[in-house]
């Protein structure tokens, strides 16, 4: 019960504070900046692997059937 009450009080406090007060604005700007870099790195990593798979798919011609 104490945890629930504490959680609710902190949530109410966080929701009532405006982004310009107490440096919250700079915190959110920095978090967004970091998020953009992390997202770009993850996307680059994912697409890098995907391009290698596409290259292999082009190298192997699916129209050619070889029986050994």
Swiss-Prot record:
Keywords: Antibiotic, Antimicrobial, Secreted, Signal. It is found in: Secreted. One of its GO terms (biological process) is defense response to bacterium. Disulfide bonds: none annotated. One of its GO terms (cellular component) is extracellular region. Residues 48-68 form a propeptide. Goblet cells. Residues 1-22 form the signal peptide. Its main location: secreted. It comes from the Eukaryota. Belongs to the pleurocidin family. Antimicrobial peptide with potent activity against Gram-positive and Gram-negative bacteria. Activity against E.coli and B.subtilis. Weaker activity against L.mucor, s.marcescens and P.aeruginosa. May play a role in innate host defense. This is Pleurocidin.
């Amino acid at each position: 019960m104490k945890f629930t009450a504490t959680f609710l009080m902190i949530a109410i406090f966080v929701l009532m504070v405006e982004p310009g007060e107490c440096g919250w604005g700079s915190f959110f700007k920095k978090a967004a900046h970091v998020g953009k870099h992390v997202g770009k790195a993850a996307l680059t990593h994912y697409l890098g692997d995907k391009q290698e798979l596409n290259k292999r798919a082009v190298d192997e011609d699916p129209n050619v059937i070889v029986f050994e």
